[in-house]
Amino acid sequence: MEEKLGAEIFDVDHTITKNITSLSYLLLLIKRRVFSITILRHIPYICMNYKYGHMADKHFDRHFDELVGVDKAFMDDLAVENFNNMMKKEKVYGDAKRYIDHLKGNNKKIILATSSMETIIKPLADYLGVDAIIATKFAFKDGKCLGRFEGKPAFREEKRKKVLEYIKENNIDLASSSFYSDSIHDYPLFMEVGNPVAVNPDFRLTRCAKKHGWPILKFR
């Protein structure tokens, strides 16, 4: 019988990167005139709802008319540009890259689990050399974006479900797996793994980590 091994699972925004990856990507879409600049007026509202845990299905279950018919290749190229901009502005934590490289050197399986879009995260995943991405996905057909998500976004409980599904399908041992995140929103997933690790935690996660005796890392 094949021995089950653990995995090292990482959140992305504010854990590996200093920025919100989807926001910097949105700014490029505005620059390319795919989205109107007026969409920016909704960003503070969305960010506040996310920060305080008030995000609901209605915030995710929406249609992006501006993206309907946009070429997947264009969106992929824009994701590469977004990543290159992040590297130029040093938006990827050097400590995170070194930490992941160390884990890879010990033959650990590395997984990114994020509510951000897979299209946006793919260049970062390639740079880090990870084994898998679990993320929110845009729906495409015949190489064109349908302007909606494929399934539910990988946020909070749904993120937990998607990770557990991947874990089961790939014969990974949860008890010897680690999960790294900055956000209390990932509490459901923290409670599933054997080794929860708070990275650059917000005040609620800091309090939670201290209560449970979880390690706290500071990536810079």
What are these regions (language model features)?
Residues F10, Y25, F83, F179-Y180:
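Aromatic side chains
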Residues S22-L23, M48-H102, N106-K108:
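Short linear elements at protein peripheries
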Residues K31-S36, M55, V70-D76, A154-E157:
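General structural signal for secondary-structure boundaries
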Residues M1-G53:
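Active-site neighborhood of HAD-like aspartate-dependent phosphohydrolases
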Residues H42-D57, M75, K122-A125, K137-A139:
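Short N-terminal helix-initiation segments at or just after the protein's N-terminus
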